[in-house]
């Protein structure tokens, strides 16, 4: 599990196709990398990946085709920056909201207006979004400001823009989206109840 509070930025330093998947290497600070060991979970732009190897400043992962199909990781290239968060340990504080690192899909930035970012996603995504509700964008825990049929927006404080990759994003770029799991469970449960009663 993760908290949605980005601990460090990383830079893609290795990117190589492996069958239908890929091998991904990321360079970061020794402060972030040193505590990690092979087998640890790390959220890379919000995607939970398992560490396959590491050294003093680099961490490596294998990314399977299913992950590439529903995230932006396959679009990364060497020198691209990514958000990093190590998995929570017992007793760690949760500064954002609980995340699994299982990305629901992607959304496109279609408008940036000062500190307000507007995104376009699928209608399937929108059914789980509510104003003032939680959302994770590239692994960052954020609060939804507005929600329409297939668009939504968030407001970003200067600290978030400075410490994450969102401050460098441009209109037209895609981001990874994880919806709040408790909200998804409630919505899906209500839909099943309505469907079984013939009221859907």
UniProtKB/Swiss-Prot annotation:
Annotated Lumazine-binding repeat ranges: 1-97, 98-190
Pfam families cross-referenced by the UniProt entry: Lum_binding
Keyword Transferase applies: yes
InterPro entries linked to this entry: ATP_synth_asu-like_sf, Lumazine-bd, Lumazine-bd_dom, Riboflavin_synthase-like_b-brl
Subunit (UniProt): Homotrimer.
Role summary: Catalyzes the dismutation of two molecules of 6,7-dimethyl-8-ribityllumazine, resulting in the formation of riboflavin and 5-amino-6-(D-ribitylamino)uracil.
Official protein name in the record: Riboflavin synthase
Organism: Chlamydia pneumoniae (Chlamydophila pneumoniae)
Record lineage: Bacteria, Pseudomonadati, Chlamydiota, Chlamydiia, Chlamydiales
Gene name of the encoded protein: ribE
């Amino acid at each position: 599990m993760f908290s949605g509070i980005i601990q460090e930025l990383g830079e893609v330093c290795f990117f190589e196709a492996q069958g239908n998947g890929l091998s991904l290497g990321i360079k970061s600070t020794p402060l972030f990398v040193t505590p990690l060991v092979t087998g640890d979970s790390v959220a890379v732009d919000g995607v939970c990946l398992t560490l396959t190897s590491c050294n003093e400043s680099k961490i490596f992962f294998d990314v399977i085709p299913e992950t590439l199909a529903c995230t932006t990781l396959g679009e990364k290239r060497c020198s691209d920056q990514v958000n990093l968060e190590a998995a929570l340990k017992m007793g760690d504080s949760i500064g954002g909201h609980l995340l699994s690192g299982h990305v629901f899909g992607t959304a496109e930035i279609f408008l940036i207006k000062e500190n307000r970012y507007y995104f376009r996603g699928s209608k399937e995504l929108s059914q789980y979004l509510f104003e003032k509700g939680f959302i994770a964008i590239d692994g960052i825990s954020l609060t939804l400001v507005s929600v329409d049929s297939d668009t939504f927006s968030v407001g970003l404080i200067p600290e978030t823009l400075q410490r994450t990759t969102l401050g460098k994003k441009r209109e037209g770029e895609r981001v990874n989206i994880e919806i709040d799991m408790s909200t998804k469970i409630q919505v899906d449960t209500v839909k099943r109840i309505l469907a079984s009663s013939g009221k859907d």
